[in-house]
Amino acid sequence: MKTVQFCFLFCCWKAICCNSCELTNITIAIENEECHFCISINTTWCAGYCYTRDLVYKDPATPNIQTTCTFKELVYETVRVPGCAHHADSFYTYPVATQCHCGKCDSDSTDCTMQGLGPDYCSFSEMKE
């Protein structure tokens, strides 16, 4: 019984005290307006949990900064979108996370909304793999 209690307490401690913000594989849809279709590519991005809290009573003197699992470092990769017209720009550059951390969401480079369209959203009806 003590082993079960220890395991339970250890899991609770791990969930509360330790962040699990890490690199994960995702599939994103890239689209080009001149090509009129999307392609799916695999990349890495940050996902997981970060310690955060939302105060019941807001104090203007104390900033309430929510942390989120976001990239610490990233690189950019470029792919050629096949099947585009010759006059169209057939190259697409996308970010690839190389290191993650729990930090403030930077709205200059990241979609910080509560619920976005998702990485696999395509505005065209045709999706090519």
UniProtKB/Swiss-Prot annotation:
Pfam family for this entry, one: Cys_knot
Family membership noted in the UniProt record: Belongs to the glycoprotein hormones subunit beta family.
Biological function: Together with the alpha chain CGA constitutes follitropin, the follicle-stimulating hormone, and provides its biological specificity to the hormone heterodimer. Binds FSHR, a G protein-coupled receptor, on target cells to activate downstream signaling pathways. Follitropin is involved in follicle development and spermatogenesis in reproductive organs.
Oligomer and partners: Heterodimer. The active follitropin is a heterodimer composed of an alpha chain/CGA shared with other hormones and a unique beta chain/FSHB shown here.
GO process annotations (BP): follicle-stimulating hormone signaling pathway; G protein-coupled receptor signaling pathway; positive regulation of bone resorption; positive regulation of gene expression; positive regulation of steroid biosynthetic process; regulation of osteoclast differentiation; regulation of signaling receptor activity; Sertoli cell proliferation
Taxonomic lineage: Eukaryota, Metazoa, Chordata, Craniata, Vertebrata
UniProt name for this protein: Follitropin subunit beta
Entry keyword annotation includes Disulfide bond: yes
GO molecular function, one term: follicle-stimulating hormone activity
Compartments, as annotated in UniProt: Secreted
One CC-aspect GO term: follicle-stimulating hormone complex
InterPro entries reported for this sequence: Cystine-knot_cytokine (IPR029034), Glyco_hormone_CN (IPR006208), Gonadotropin_bsu (IPR001545), Gonadotropin_bsu_CS (IPR018245)
Gene giving rise to this polypeptide: FSHB
Signal peptide annotation: 1-20
Disulphide bridges, residue numbers: 21-69, 35-84, 38-122, 46-100, 50-102, 105-112
Record key words, sorted: Disulfide bond, Glycoprotein, Hormone, Secreted, Signal
Species whose genome carries this gene: Aotus nancymaae (Ma's night monkey)
Glycosylated residue positions: 25, 42
